[in-house]
UniProtKB/Swiss-Prot annotation:
GO terms for molecular function: 23S rRNA (guanine(2445)-N(2))-methyltransferase activity; RNA binding; rRNA (guanine-N7-)-methyltransferase activity. It catalyses: guanosine(2445) in 23S rRNA + S-adenosyl-L-methionine = N(2)-methylguanosine(2445) in 23S rRNA + S-adenosyl-L-homocysteine + H(+); guanosine(2069) in 23S rRNA + S-adenosyl-L-methionine = N(2)-methylguanosine(2069) in 23S rRNA + S-adenosyl-L-homocysteine + H(+). CDD domains: AdoMet_MTases (cd02440), THUMP_AdoMetMT (cd11715). Keywords: Cytoplasm, Methyltransferase, RNA-binding, rRNA processing, S-adenosyl-L-methionine, Transferase. The keyword DNA repair does not apply. It is found in: Cytoplasm. Specifically methylates the guanine in position 2445 (m2G2445) and the guanine in position 2069 (m7G2069) of 23S rRNA. InterPro entries: 23SrRNA_methyltr_KL, DNA_methylase_N6_adenine_CS, RlmKL-like_Mtase, RlmKL-like_Mtase_CS, RlmL_1st, SAM-dep_methyl-trfase, SAM-dependent_MTases_sf, THUMP_dom. Its EC number is 2.1.1.173, 2.1.1.264. This is Ribosomal RNA large subunit methyltransferase K/L.
Length: 711
C-alpha cells in the first residue's frame, strides 16, 4: 500500500531517509513530501515517531476530477459509513492547483456536502463539522485534474508536539528545528559525548527538540497522550497502543540517561523565561542550561566538541542583520572553533555575512520564507574568499550578474511553488552576451549547483577578441552569482553547419550528476556531450503526462534518455514502453529507471525505428508521447524528415491509442508546419504550445511546439 507524508520544502530527502529507518518498504522524495510504500502500521508509526513530517496521509480514493461535479461524484461513491462513526465530527483540508477548481475552500465544502448527503441517503445522522479538533480529518489533493482523498492520520500538523506553552515572536516550527539538528549531525555528536549550543535560542525550540531527540522521545507521545490521533474507523487501535507502549519504554530509559550537555542563551530575558517554561513542560528542563547574554558575551561550553544550532533573526533591515550575523560568526570562531555549526539564515547573503565557510548549503523554507541552511565542520576553517574582498567584476560582467539576480528573483516564487531544481537562468537576455545558462542542482549529497553554459555562435562581423572577452565576463558573472567554482561549469558551443560535430564528445570526464524533476531522480552528463540527457524546456509537458499516466499505459516514442517514461512511472503509471533506435540512450533510460527502483517487466525498453515499430505493433496505450528529431539518417533505418513524415507518424501513433487515450506530439523544428488537413482525417488536434512553456523559457517560447491529439 502507498501513503504520503508531507513536509516543508527542502526536507524531502531527510524525511525519506527517516521513514526508511522507521521501517517503510520504500520512500521516494517528491515536491513537499515523500511517497511511501508500507502498511497501515508503518503510517501510524510515522505519526508517532517522525520528527520531520508535517502530515501523514492515508489514501481512500483517487480519481479523475475535471470539475466540481466530478469531485462530488467521486467522494459520494465512497462508503462513508465504513470511515466515519455516527455522531463523530468531520473536517476537510484541500489543496488545489492546475485545475478548473481554483478555490480550495470551495473544494473542501463540496467534499463535506458529498459526505453529508451520502450518509443522509443511508439513513445515518448528519456529521457535524469541527475545524479545530475533528474526529476525522480528510485531505484533498487536486492537481492537474487528478484528485486524491486521504485520511489525515495524525489529525493535524505534526510539528505541534504538545510542549509549547510559551513562545517568543515568530517561533521556529519543531519539524524544521529537527531538520537543522539532523543536518548538523546532532544525534551522532551526542552519542560521541558532544554538546549542543544555541546562542540565540529564543523560546528554546532547537534546544528542546535536541534534548527530546537525544532522550529518544517519540515526538507524538506528548502530543496525543492517551488519545488516538484519529477516530477514523479504519485506524488500527490495537496496533497504535502497542506502538505507544514501546515508545513509553524507550522514553523512560532515554530520559533517565539524558546527559546535561545542552546550553542556550539569548539577550532577551522574556525569551529565556519562555524557553524555561517550555523545557519544563517537555520534561527536559534539567538537561538544558539557559542564560541571558548577548551573542558577543558567549562563554565556551565545557565540551570539547559539539554542534552549534541557531536561527538568527532576520527582517527587512538587511544591513543591521548582516552586522549581527558577522558578530555571530566571529564569536563562534573564537568560542567553539572545533565544533560543527548548523545555522538557519534568512537568505544566502546573510549566511555569507557570518564569514564562516559552509561545507554544505541547503535551501529550506520556514513557512513561506526561503532560508539558507549552512553547515560548517569545523567552524574554524576560514572561507577561501574574504568577505571584505570579493572578486571585482568588470562593467560588462556586472551587467550580466545584475540580470542573473533579477531573473532569479523573478523565478523565485514559481520555482518554490513547483519544486523546480533545474532551470534556465539566462537566455541571451543581453544580446551582446549571447549564451544560455542552465542551472542543475544535485539531488543527493551536498546538493551542489552545476552550471551548463551554451555559447551561441557570434556573427562573423564581431572580432574574436570581443567574443572571448564577453564570454569570460559572462562566466565570471555566473560563477559569482551562483557561487560555483570553475570545475562545476560546463561550457558548450552551439553552431550551425558543422557537419556531425553537434553530437560529438566535448570532455572525457564521465561525471554523472543526479538531479530531480517531478519527484524522479535523473542522471545527467553535463560535460561530455552537447546535450545533457534532460531537455529542460519540456518540463511542464512531462509533468502533465506524468499526472495523466497514473494507473495507465504510457508509450514514449523517440524516448532519448527516457525522462518522460521515468516520471510517468514515478507518478504511478501501470506500465511504460520506451522506444528508441539508439542503444546508448536506451541504456541511459534503463539507468534512470533503476535509479528510481523501477526496473522490471512493467517498464519495457525497445530498440527500434519508432515509425516501423508503430506500424507493426498491435498493443494499445492510454498516453503516448512523440517527440521526434527534425532529421535522422541512421544506417539502421530509413532516413527520417519530420516535415515530410509527420502525418504518417501521427496516423500510426493514433492507431495505438486506447479508447479515451491521448497523444502528445512535440518538435523543435522552427520551420515546421503541421498538415492540419492530413491530421484531421484521423484525429482531433489542438495546439497546446503556450501551456508547455514554463517561465524560464518564455523569452524564446518557440523553442518547441506541441499538440494534443485524440482519436
Amino acid at each position: 500500500m502507498k501513503f504520503f507524508a508531507s513536509c516543508a520544502k527542502g526536507l524531502e530527502y531527510l524525511l525519506a531517509d527517516e521513514l526508511l529507518a522507521l521501517g517503510a518498504s520504500k520512500a521516494t522524495a517528491t515536491i513537499s513530501g515523500v511517497n511511501v510504500e508500507g502498511e497501515l502500521r508503518d503510517a501510524q508509526r510515522a505519526v508517532l515517531w517522525s520528527r520531520l513530517a508535517s502530515r501523514v496521509l492515508w489514501p481512500l480514493s483517487e480519481f479523475d476530477c475535471p470539475d466540481e461535479d466530478a469531485l462530488y461524484a467521486g467522494v459520494a461513491e465512497l462508503p462513508w459509513d465504513a470511515h466515519l462513526s455516527v455522531g463523530h465530527t468531520l473536517s476537510v483540508d484541500a489543496h488545489v492547483s492546475g485545475t478548473a477548481i481554483t478555490h480550495a475552500r470551495y473544494a473542501a465544502q463540496r467534499i463535506k456536502d458529498a459526505v453529508v448527503d451520502t450518509m443522509r441517503r443511508q439513513g445515518l445522522e448528519r456529521p457535524s463539522v469541527d475545524v479545530e479538533s475533528p474526529d476525522l480529518r480528510l485531505n484533498l489533493s487536486l492537481r492537474k485534474g487528478r484528485a486524491t482523498i486521504s485520511v489525515d492520520l495524525g489529525g493535524g500538523p505534526l510539528h505541534r508536539r504538545g510542549w509549547r506553552m510559551a513562545q517568543n515572536e515568530a517561533p521556529l516550527k519543531e519539524n524544521l528545528a529537527a531538520a537543522v539538528l539532523m543536518r548538523g549531525g546532532w544525534p551522532r555528536a551526542y552519542a560521541d559525548g558532544g554538546g549542543l549550543l544555541d546562542p540565540m535560542c529564543g523560546s528554546g525550540t532547537l534546544l528542546i527538540e535536541g534534548a527530546l531527540m537525544a532522550a529518544d522521545v517519540a515526538p507524538g507521545l506528548q502530543r496525543y497522550g492517551s488519545d488516538l490521533p484519529s477516530r477514523w474507523r479504519g485506524f488500527d487501535r490495537n496496533g497504535w497502543q502497542q506502538l505507544v507502549s514501546e515508545a513509553r519504554e524507550r522514553d523512560s530509559v532515554g530520559r533517565a540517561a539524558l546527559k546535561q550537555v545542552i546550553h542556550g542563551s539569548d539577550m532577551d530575558p522574556h525569551a529565556i523565561r519562555a524557553a524555561k517554561e517550555n523545557a519544563q513542560v517537555a520534561g527536559v528542563a534539567e538537561a538544558i542550561w539557559f542564560g541571558v547574554c548577548e551573542v558577543g558575551e558567549l562563554q565556551t561550553p565545557p565540551q570539547a566538541t559539539g554542534v552549534v544550532v541557531c536561527n538568527p533573526p532576520y527582517d527587512e533591515r538587511l544591513a543591521a542583520d548582516a552586522a549581527l550575523y558577522r558578530r555571530l560568526g566571529d564569536t563562534l570562531q573564537c568560542a567553539v572553533p572545533q565544533w560543527r555549526a548548523s545555522l538557519l539564515c534568512g537568505n544566502a547573503e546573510l549566511a555569507y555575512a557570518t564569514g564562516l565557510r559552509a561545507g554544505k548549503k541547503y535551501q529550506l523554507f520556514n513557512g513561506a520564507i526561503e532560508c539558507a541552511l549552512i553547515v560548517c565542520d569545523p567552524i574554524a576553517v576560514p572561507r577561501r574568499t574574504p568577505l571584505a574582498a570579493p572578486t571585482a567584476l568588470s562593467e560588462g560582467a556586472q551587467m550580466v550578474a545584475n540580470r542573473l539576480r533579477k531573473n532569479l528573483q523573478k523565478f523565485k516564487k514559481w520555482r518554490a511553488r513547483e519544486g523546480v531544481e533545474c532551470f534556465r537562468a539566462y537566455d541571451a537576455d543581453l544580446p551582446e552576451y549571447s549564451a544560455a545558462i542552465d542551472v542543475y542542482q544535485q539531488a543527493d549529497g551536498d546538493r551542489r549547483i552545476f552550471l551548463h553554459v551554451q555559447e551561441y555562435a557570434a556573427p562573423a562581423t564581431i572580432p574574436e577578441a570581443d567574443v572571448r572577452r564577453r564570454l569570460n565576463e559572462l562566466l565570471a558573472a555566473a560563477r559569482e552569482v551562483f557561487e560555483v567554482p570553475a570545475e562545476r561549469v560546463a561550457l558548450k558551443s552551439r553552431e550551425r553547419g558543422k557537419g556531425g560535430s553537434k553530437y560529438g564528445r566535448f570532455e572525457q570526464r564521465n561525471e554523472i550528476v543526479h538531479v530531480r524533476e517531478h519527484g524522479a531522480l535523473l542522471r545527467v552528463n553535463l560535460f561530455d556531450y552537447l546535450d545533457t540527457g534532460l531537455f529542460l524546456d519540456h518540463r511542464p509537458l512531462r509533468g502533465t503526462m506524468a499526472q495523466q499516466s497514473r494507473g495507465r499505459r504510457f508509450l514514449n516514442l523517440f524516448c532519448y534518455t527516457g525522462v518522460a517514461s521515468v516520471e510517468a512511472a514515478v507518478a504511478g503509471a501501470a506500465s511504460t514502453t520506451s522506444v528508441d533506435l539508439s542503444g546508448t540512450y536506451l541504456q541511459w533510460c534503463a539507468d534512470n529507471l533503476a535509479l528510481n527502483g523501477l526496473a522490471g517487466s512493467k517498464h519495457k525498453l525497445v530498440q527500434a525505428d519508432a515509425l516501423a515499430w508503430l506500424e507493426a505493433e498491435r498493443a494499445h496505450f492510454d498516453v503516448i508521447f512523440c517527440d521526434p528529431p527534425t532529421f535522422s539518417n541512421s544506417a539502421r533505418a530509413e532516413d527520417f524528415d519530420i516535415q515530410r513524415a509527420h502525418v504518417r507518424l501521427l496516423r500510426a501513433a493514433v492507431a495505438r491509442l486506447a479508447p479515451g487515450g491521448v497523444l502528445y506530439f512535440s518538435n523543435n523544428f522552427r520551420r515546421f508546419k503541421l498538415d492540419e488537413e492530413g491530421v484531421a482525417e484521423f484525429a482531433q488536434c489542438e495546439d497546446i504550445s503556450p501551456s508547455t512553456i514554463d517561465p524560464d523559457f518564455e523569452r524564446h517560447a518557440r523553442i518547441h511546439r506541441a499538440w494534443r491529439l485524440t482519436a
